Amino acid sequence: KKQIMLVGGRFSGFLAEYLAAHLRLLRPGISVVGHDELSRATAVADANRQTVLVVFDYRRYTVWAEHLAQTVQAQGATVCLMTDVWLSPIARTSSVVLPCPVESPSPFDSITAATAVVESLIAAVTEQLGEHGKRRVALAEGILRDA
């Protein structure tokens, strides 16, 4: 079974955490790569052909995220990129690229469209896993309720 690692930037890290929280309920093998050097180093050490790295990289692209993506890909991992319409440099080598608009009337980019893409991914994974995923969610929710 694939190991899924997720990583995001200053603001998009929220999206990585949000997707990871849902995926953890649905299946094992989910981790979020922290922004610190140790987290990135151990992510690289753990990466192999069974790894999928989901990178959230939007305008003001993150240099360390690009390096992380290139390094794990060199070890056989698959890279899936969530980015804006201008495309992060990581797009050049990613197996999957999911761009979305980020324009906003404020000085900050909007994550509204990106959140919708994440919600769609959660729905697709839930459907793909079928009853197994639903049973796992029910079990986890039961454990959380009883805690």
Place the predicted regions along the sequence by residue.
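Glycine-rich phosphate-binding loops that contact phosphosugars or nucleotide phosphates
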Residues: 2-116, 123-127
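Context-gated lysine
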Residues: 1-2, 134
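Internal, active-site/partner-interface "lid" segment
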Residues: 128-147
